[in-house]
Design a protein with these regions (language model features):
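All-alpha prenyltransferase/terpene-synthase fold signal
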Residues: 1-306
Length: 306
């Protein structure tokens, strides 16, 4: 897959390759392509097309990162400067556009309308989720349902598509395809919920970013929503002021409120429920080392610190 990524990043425009390689070289978990490849293994598909589509998924994800960092005005990702900080906003946005268009070129090469439909829908839903999150910024009254709706669009949808693509490549039955998609959606939901916990309780040295970055950017995530529900009137006022202004000068107080209300434990419990839903969805697959790896992946998400 890495060879495919390297080859398809090529462009006659030097800056495109420079920025693309900069963000790809930053590392990352490669979770979405790994999910696709593991699911292909679980379904017995060994064709070369799996590497092409794994690269497509990674390109789409990388494009969203480039655009997200511009929208969020982020300066640090994975412990080093974001592409927009290093190269400027215009270049980052345009290279993100290039990665989207290159991904669509590659999915056309697959020659399967179902694959193109799956990826086109996923890309559209991700964009809708990002816009909805933008509309929800600094909203202290955001509900848990509204929060879940956003993360299922902007994060879980690409996990879902990755798992579904494996089923399409393997020519699986509609029942198996649906189970794969269910696994991906639940896994992606758990991943984002844990990510939101880490903004208040993560290992800064491993994350490569600071605690409270989401709050500073105006993102209202599940730990804050639960803390708002459970806090005293004074605590709610403190949280509301921070949410509406993005002021993290009282971050120590905010962290104490989140801890005292049990918001982190409740959020982790939500992630655990989603991880179990993912594991349960795998019951339709034969018991192989690949299925075991997919089950382990769901369990490991709950214990990550970055």
């Amino acid at each position: 897959m890495d060879l495919v990524i390297e080859r398809r990043l090529s462009s006659e425009v030097a800056l495109i390759g420079q920025i693309s390689r900069y963000i790809v070289a930053a590392g990352g978990k490669r979770l979405r392509p790994a999910l696709l490849l593991l699911m292909c293994g679980a379904l017995g598909y060994k064709g070369e097309q799996r590497f092409n589509l794994a690269a497509v998924v990674e390109f789409i994800h990388t494009a969203t990162l480039l655009h997200d960092d511009v929208v969020d005005e982020s300066t640090l990702r994975r412990g080093r400067e974001t592409a927009n900080e290093a190269f400027g906003n215009p270049a980052s946005v345009l290279v993100g556009d290039f990665l989207y268009s290159r991904a669509f070129q590659m999915m056309v090469d697959a020659g399967d309308m179902r694959i193109m439909r799956t990826l086109a829908e996923a890309t559209n839903v991700i964009a809708e989720g990002e816009v909805q999150q933008l509309m929800n910024m600094h909203d202290a009254g955001l509900s848990e349902d509204e929060y879940v709706r956003v993360i299922r669009s902007k994060t879980a949808k690409l996990f879902e598509a990755s798992a579904r693509l494996a089923a399409l490549l393997a020519l699986s039955s509609p029942e198996v395809e649906a189970a794969c998609a269910d696994y991906g959606q639940a896994l992606g939901t758990a991943f984002q919920v844990i990510d939101d916990v880490l903004d208040y309780d993560g290992d800064v040295s491993e994350m490569g970013k600071n605690l409270g970055d989401d709050l500073r950017e105006g993102k209202v995530t599940l730990p804050l929503i639960i803390a708002m529900q459970r806090g005293t009137e004074v605590e709610r006022q403190t949280l509301q002021q921070a949410i509406e202004t993005g002021d993290t000068s009282k971050m120590a107080d905010i962290l104490a409120i989140v801890q005292r209300t049990g918001a982190l434990e409740a959020t982790l419990a939500t992630a655990a429920v989603q991880a179990q839903i993912a594991v349960d969805a795998l019951s339709i697959l034969p018991d192989t080392a690949y299925r075991q790896a997919l089950m382990q992946l769901a369990a490991q998400l709950l214990n990550r610190r970055a």
